[in-house]
Amino acid sequence: MAEHPTPTTSDADETTRVVTPRPEEASAVLDLADRAGAADGHPPLSDQTRVLLARGGQLWWGATQGSDGAIDGAAVLVPEGAAAVLELVVDPAARRIGRGTALADAAADAVRDLAREDTTSVWAHGMLPGAVRLARRHGLEPVRELRRMRLSHAALAALPEVRLADGVTLRGFVPGQDEQAWLDVNAAAFADHPEQGSLTRADLDDRMAEDWFDADGLLLAAREADGRLLGFHWTKVEPDAGADGPRVGEVYAVGVSPDAQGLGLGRALTLAGLHRMAEQGVDVVDLYVDADNTAAVALYTSLGFELFAADAQYRRP
């Protein structure tokens, strides 16, 4: 293998373009991400990137290959309007031989070609030392910390009961009925969140098509008087969770409409989802929260969640 392999892409032009990877290419990158995630304990690609790869969305990507021709490293750059988000992943068996450096250099060229040098964010999932070194080598600085918090099995077994405000009821999501109402509440609840608040109907449909989606696990808080949606807790339990370790559930998203603040819905919804996942037999529960969202961090800490890992987002100063 070459010490500094030249990344290949599905686009033969010298000028960088946003393209759609072939299905077999996308599948290979997703398999690579699964291998790396299993080895590192941290998923190297965000859900949005995985969804785009799976559905054939448009993005820039580059890859390195081993002597057998198999993809052993990949960089994925997802355009978001005038900005972009970059993620890199290298097979655990192909590290420390220049794969990450080659991919980062190719991605930097792509960012320049796409005129997004000042608006591209780069994720270092798990803040692995190699990823942090690459970010610094390219003159990037951390601008955001995403904490991964975990609720232990003991804490999960000792959860307090759910207390709902008067006039509020809980129910499961109904496909074909609740999509627009959910999108409206999600957009309002996450108006300042760069990923969650921008979800579209297509994004929602893609997630509903995932094998882990469970309509009853997307809990909705509604006003009894008129059925108006006030908030939600979207839980996530992978079908094969627990196959190679603890069975992990996830607080995928908790959102409360701004005009329903003050009713204690954030705590009630979080607890309701945790109880449901406990009934499903999960061993522990994870969640992701921005470090500067002090109110949410305080809520989760009060329920027994502890810091487990962290992701860092880098950008040019």
Curated annotation (Swiss-Prot):
Residues 1-24 are annotated as: Disordered. It holds the Pfam family Acetyltransf_1. GO terms for molecular function: mycothiol synthase activity. This is Mycothiol acetyltransferase. It comes from the Bacteria. Catalyzes the transfer of acetyl from acetyl-CoA to desacetylmycothiol (Cys-GlcN-Ins) to form mycothiol. It catalyses: 1D-myo-inositol 2-(L-cysteinylamino)-2-deoxy-alpha-D-glucopyranoside + acetyl-CoA = mycothiol + CoA + H(+). HAMAP family: MshD. Monomer. Residues 1-10 have a biased composition (Polar residues). One of its GO terms (biological process) is mycothiol biosynthetic process. The keyword Cell membrane does not apply. Keywords: Acyltransferase, Repeat, Transferase. InterPro entries: Acyl_CoA_acyltransferase (IPR016181), GNAT_dom (IPR000182), Mycothiol_AcTrfase (IPR017813). SUPFAM superfamilies: Acyl-CoA N-acyltransferases (Nat). Residues 14-166, 168-317 form the N-acetyltransferase domain. Its EC number is 2.3.1.189. Acetyl-CoA 2 binds at residues 254-256, 261-267.
